[in-house]
Swiss-Prot record:
May act as the primary docking protein directing membrane turnover and assembly of the transient receptor potential channels trpc4 and trpc5. Binds phospholipids. InterPro entries: CRAL-TRIO_dom, Spectrin/alpha-actinin, Spectrin_SESTD1. Disulfide bonds: none annotated. PANTHER family: SEC14 DOMAIN AND SPECTRIN REPEAT-CONTAINING PROTEIN 1. Signal peptide: none annotated. This is SEC14 domain and spectrin repeat-containing protein 1. Residues 1-153 form the CRAL-TRIO domain. Belongs to the SOLO family. The gene is sestd1. One of its GO terms (biological process) is blood vessel morphogenesis. It comes from the Eukaryota. Residues 696-707 have a biased composition (Acidic residues).
Length: 714
């Protein structure tokens, strides 16, 4: 019978074992009768339960039953005493009926007990509460009988529930653990590792053990406290004493439970290891089967490199999706590898070879698949870079071709040089891009030539041949386009150089006009002196001749340049640019220079004739001092001088009717003054000569007169 089944009855406290003992060490059973009608059935149930608690040894020492009739009627007390005969006649050694203060009819009570004495089998005495100490020590009596023994009925009931629950659960758990451990031993011997043998206990062993330890600890603590207070009149024996709750039984259950639980833990460890190993095997095969199955099939179908950037990007996106699916399985591989490494570090020899085999198989498949993914990714990246370079080169070639096809009309040579520089830079960039395309194409071809077939069978020669042909086709097409552009660049370069020459000729022709104009300006403004004597004039004539030669060379150079522009324009098929104002300006300036030069030449020649004539008259040599000059010479000098002076006042008249003087008025006055001084000297010479001639005539006349006188005198 369990306390939980009769819990409401037990809580009524119809009877209880307080833990106290009589002088014979027999247990004291107390039946506290109350004023209310007591149910004999419930009392009998309570007594049956209580008498099942003590051990047989305790029962052999007999019970002392205290029937508290102070609050009850005699007939109820009598019924209870008679009932004891039917419930525990052999175990009862003494029944103490505690009488109330108002004593029952002595004759009746004595007669009844005496009458039933032989039939009852135990002694029944009537005693007042204060006389119980004659039979039982005060420390073994509870406080309602004047004793010092502490008893809490509800606490006792709760502890009984705990004890019985522990006993029930531990016994059941112990049986289950024994069965599980034995079954596990048999399954290991038969190598039977089916999941059906993985039986779990009905109760949590840790919880049951914890409950048992707490219960045992409390029992031991109660016994310790009770033994301390038992001899000093304090707290006496507790109802949770080992004789009532069988502390050794708890200890024995705990020991057995710990032993079987230790074995069960090993069983669980073996189960966990087997389960983990089986789970690892399952996951390994899942990874291997997927990688060698769907994963390999996905890679087998992806061998193209695309024919454009967009196609290559689409293939890369598809490959990323494949990689994403593989990544999930690679993550499982990493987790499995860690689990296998942990199991290997545990050092279980039994599964060591199997684990290593699984690890090796998993690693081989994963690394092989990862290398295929990486190879495919590298090929796609190289293909993308190849197509990117090809597109960039194609755009550069298109731009260069458009630039070459455009009809440009540069404004000057600097613009042409800039255009040529831009063309050269474009061509150089195209050459660099083509070289990069060749390098990337060759790298891609090398990658594809090193490509191997999958270990599960499919050669990839057909797919590779298409890819290789496409790469060669792209590179050859780009090479041809580049060659065509180079040819057109050569033609454009030649045309540009001719245009540079044209602009240069026009520029130099304009420069020749400017130089000729500068020479004319210099001739008019600086070539003014006519010389102070014939020698200086002769030098000026030589310089003038050279100056005219320079001007003639400049004019001829300008004419040649303008003729070259005509030829270049014919070659370039453009209108003759030199038919503008350059040639008229050149001719106009040259005519002006010719007129001016002739005038300068004429003036220098007149000055030379003047100085020569004057120098014949004016001689500084002493031998020629008395040399007489003809009158015609003087007249010639005077005529030349006046003509030269008149010439200085005459401007240079250009073909267009414009006029220009040599130098400034001051320059002309200076030149005229020099001529006049020379003429003055000649005039003085003439005067002196005339005086000399007059004196000579006078002397001759005097001589003639003298000669005429002498004959007369003689």
């Amino acid at each position: 019978m369990e306390a939980s089944c009769i819990l409401p009855v037990l809580k009524k406290k119809l009877a209880f074992l307080s833990g106290g003992k009589d002088r014979r060490s027999g247990l004291i059973l107390t039946i506290p009768l109350c004023t209310e009608q007591t149910s004999m059935e419930e009392l009998s149930t309570t007594l049956d339960y209580l008498l099942g608690i003590p051990s047989e040894k305790c029962k052999a020492r007999g019970f002392t039953v205290i029937v508290d009739g102070r609050k009850s009627q005699w007939n109820i007390v009598k019924t209870v005493v008679l009932m004891l005969q039917n419930v525990i006649p052999a175990e009862v050694s003494l029944v103490c009926v505690v009488k109330p203060d108002e004593f029952w009819d002595k004759k009746v009570t004595h007669f009844c007990f005496w009458k039933e004495k032989d039939r009852l089998g135990f002694e029944v005495i009537l005693v007042s509460a204060n006389k119980l100490t004659r039979y039982i020590e005060p420390c073994q009596l509870t406080d309602e009988f004047g004793g010092s023994l502490l008893y809490d009925h509800l606490d006792w009931v709760n502890k009984r529930l705990v004890f019985e629950k522990f006993t029930k659960e531990s016994t059941s758990l112990l049986d289950e653990l024994i069965v599980i451990n034995e079954n596990e031993k048999g399954s290991q011997a038969e190598k039977d590792r089916s999941s059906e043998s993985n039986i779990l206990p009905s109760f949590d062993p840790e919880t049951v053990l914890q409950t048992g330890h707490e219960l045992l600890s409390e029992l031991q603590q109660r016994r310790f406290n009770g033994s301390e207070g038992g001899g000093g009149g304090g707290t006496a024996w507790s109802p949770m004493d080992d004789e009532l709750l069988a502390q050794p039984q708890v200890m024995k259950l705990l020991d057995s439970l710990r032993e079987q639980y230790t074995k069960y833990q090993e069983v669980c460890r073996q189960r966990s290891k087997r389960s983990q190993l089986e789970e690892i095997q399952t996951k390994v095969m899942q990874v291997v089967n997927w990688l060698e199955g769907p994963g390999t099939d996905q890679l087998r179908t992806q061998w193209g490199i695309g024919d454009s950037i967009r196609a290559s990007q689409a293939l890369q996106q598809k490959h990323e999706e494949i990689e994403s699916q593989h990544s999930e399985w690679f993550a499982v591989y990493v987790e499995l590898n860690q689990q296998i490494a942990a199991l290997l570090s545990a050092g279980d020899e039994e599964d060591l070879m199997e684990l290593k085999g699984l690890q090796q198989q998993l690693s081989d498949v994963c690394y092989r698949q990862a290398s295929q993914l990486e190879f495919r990714q590298n090929v796609l990246q190289s293909a993308y870079e190849f197509h990117m370079t090809a597109q960039d080169l194609s755009q550069q070639l298109d731009g260069l071709l458009g630039m070459l096809c455009a009809d440009v009309a540069p404004a000057d040579g600097a613009a042409i040089q800039q255009t040529l520089k831009h063309l050269e830079e474009k061509l150089k960039s195209v050459e660099s891009a083509l070289q990069t395309l060749r390098e990337k194409g060759q790298a891609l071809l090398d990658q594809m030539s090193n490509q191997t077939s999958f270990s599960y069978g499919k050669e990839v020669g057909v797919e590779n041949k298409e890819n290789i042909d496409h790469i060669h086709s792209v590179m050859e097409d780009m090479q041809l386009r580049k060659q065509r552009c180079e040819d057109m660049v050569d033609v454009r370069r030649l045309k540009m150089l001719q245009m540079v020459q044209l602009f240069k000729c026009e520029e130099d022709a304009s420069q020749a006009v400017e130089w000729l104009g500068e020479l004319l300006d210099a001739l008019l403004k600086t070539h003014i002196r006519l010389g102070d004597d014939s020698q200086e004039t002769k030098v000026l004539l030589e310089k003038h001749k050279k100056f005219v030669d320079v001007a003639q060379s400049t004019y001829d150079y300008g004419r040649q340049l303008l003729q070259a522009t005509v030829v270049l324009c014919q070659s370039l098929r453009c209108t003759t640019r030199s038919s503008g104002d350059t040639l008229p300006r050149l001719n106009r300036v040259w005519k002006q220079f010719t007129v001016t030069s002739d005038e300068r030449q004429h003036r220098l020649e007149m000055a030379s004739a003047f100085h020569t004539a004057a120098e014949k008259i004016v001689r500084e040599s002493p031998e020629l001092a008395e040399l007489l000059v003809d009158v015609e010479a003087y007249e010639e000098v005077e005529t030349l001088g006046k003509g030269l002076l008149d010439r200085l006042t005459v401007p240079v008249i250009f073909p267009d009717g414009s006029e220009q003087f040599f130098g400034s008025p001051g320059d002309m006055a200076s030149s005229a003054e020099s001529i006049r001084e020379r003429m003055k000297l000649v005039e003085e010479k003439r005067f002196l000569q005339e005086e000399a001639e007059q004196r000579l005539e006078e002397e001759e006349e005097e001589e003639e007169a003298a000669l005429e006188v002498e004959p007369r005198e003689s």
